[in-house]
Amino acid sequence: MNLLYLGLLLFVTLLTTLYLASSKAIFAFSDWTFHAARVEEIYLNLKSGSFFTFIAARTFHNTGAASFLFYPYIFFYPWAFLRFILSPVNAFYAWYALVTFATATISYFSMKAYSKKSLASFIFSLVYTFAPYRLYLGGAVFGEYLAVIFLPLLFLGIYEVLWGDKKKWYLLAISGALVAYAHILSVFLSLEFAVILFIIKLITSRGISKDRIKSLLLSAGVCVFLVLPVIVPFFTDFIGQGLSSAKPSISYTMGPRYLLLNSFSAQKGWKLSFMLMLTILTAWAFIKSRRNWIIYGLGLFACFLTTRYFPWKLTAGTPFEMVQLTARYLSYASLFLTILLALGSSSVLEEHVTGRKKLALSCSLAVFMALFSLSSLSVYRDTLKHVQDMPKTSANSTQPAPFKRLRDYNYYNQFNYKILFGAFDYMPKSSLTSVQKQNSLLMHQAYLNGKTLTLSPLIKANQISYQVKSEKAADVDLPVIAYKHTTVSVNGQKHAFRRGNRGTVVVGLKRGQNTVTVGYKASPVFYLSIVISILSWLALLIYLVKFKAKYAQ
């Protein structure tokens, strides 16, 4: 049955993707320009023969912003590689399909390992993968979108360590690493629920065995080794460097009425589906096991966290402010409530349906979910028909990227606009003290001998060069951000520099024409972390092969 269900999941994936791709357009909204610029930088660096991307030399207005150091991007490589063989729009939709099918597949097998029921796993995968909130994430919010792939596997790993087969600790290590590769904030959110589950374990089991504690610590330790390349840059380049990050504050909470009423609409967005709302309203009458009561409680609590009824004001000044948008908890609400929906509905259906009827039922469920998803995506599709194409603007524009339509012919127009969200993330705090400073970076303005110069950059992978003519020996303040491992050369010779009041590179020049090149050289510790991570993955793979062989005996 696995092949049948995977085939049906692939069918729904392709149908929904082709529905969007047939528009031959993308709606650039929310975080789209931030992530699209990162993918473009990776693609162009790959094209020039550089595998690693550290700073934004070609995008982000050539400011050298280091979002690549502090915001994971490994799962953007498939999108970047697709750019070599497909047009920009088609490359995105091909990547979108890959991510969707990966979500469906991992969801299916995670639920299968938990429930041992194929039909329940199929229903879970359909509802979870094509949930309205996840469809919303797939339009632009790609960090969360990628993290959602691995949440079912992550919570399967937590379950195995705390209640199930503790020898499967590796599931938690692997899934935790994959979530970290996708979205650091999702690690924090997942940790919140992991702590809750740990407390529930202590209460319901009146403690926890030493063996389970060992498995928990082992999974955490291995996970750290796997994610070292993500962690190390924070120690080598962020801590103590006066850099900014995403603003830690709760900027939006939903009202319960908004969540309830919108969840009964068929459109994608900050909502649950009507199926999950019905699960909330009816599941309590059918739940019999303590385990399912725990799952139900977690689903309700996740919904509660999305609303303003939770005292979010009390979290001011705490790490919980990193959440920013409480709608992020909808992914967790969808996960827990979909488990109950899948278990309950599959039990009822399997009592009354067998043989060929079961095959027909599975196909019907796939068609229903496909139609439901197409309905959820219809507003987005209609928007693509009526919104205007993104117009051209100057290469050093300070105008924020508008919510407009991108096609292949105007795809590159977006990169001349100021990135709407995240343009100044991970820059020195001194860069952000005034709009004038920010705009001077976007407009490529340098300061020399009391004058303002507008320069044109010469670009290579992780490298930005400027031609600067000085009438006398003087310091020039370039529109490129200075980091701990920034490198500077003047006329081909390595040169000392300092950080100016814009957080930028300030370097002394001799009289005459000078070529100043600003680059980035990663710490040796970073490359060591990659080696350790790769060796850890290989060691884990060898362990799994031996474990499976022993388990089979």
Region annotations inferred by a language model:
Residues 157, 169-184, 219-225:
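Membrane-interface alpha helices of multi-pass inner-membrane proteins
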Residues 154-168:
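Membrane-interface transmembrane helices that cradle and orient dolichyl/undecaprenyl
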Residues 8-9, 208-232, 294-301, 367:
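Hydrophobic alpha-helical membrane-interfacial segments at the cytosolic entry of transmembrane helices
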Residues 190-220:
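Perimembrane helix-loop-helix junctions
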Residues 15-114, 119-152:
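Active-site lumenal/periplasmic loops and adjacent helix-entry segments of GT-C-fold
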Residues 225, 272-296, 300-301:
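Hydrophobic, aromatic-rich transmembrane alpha-helices
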Residues 1-18, 540-553:
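Start-transfer (signal-anchor) and selected internal transmembrane alpha helices
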Residues 429-553:
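Active-site-proximal, structured, solvent-exposed surfaces of multi-pass membrane proteins
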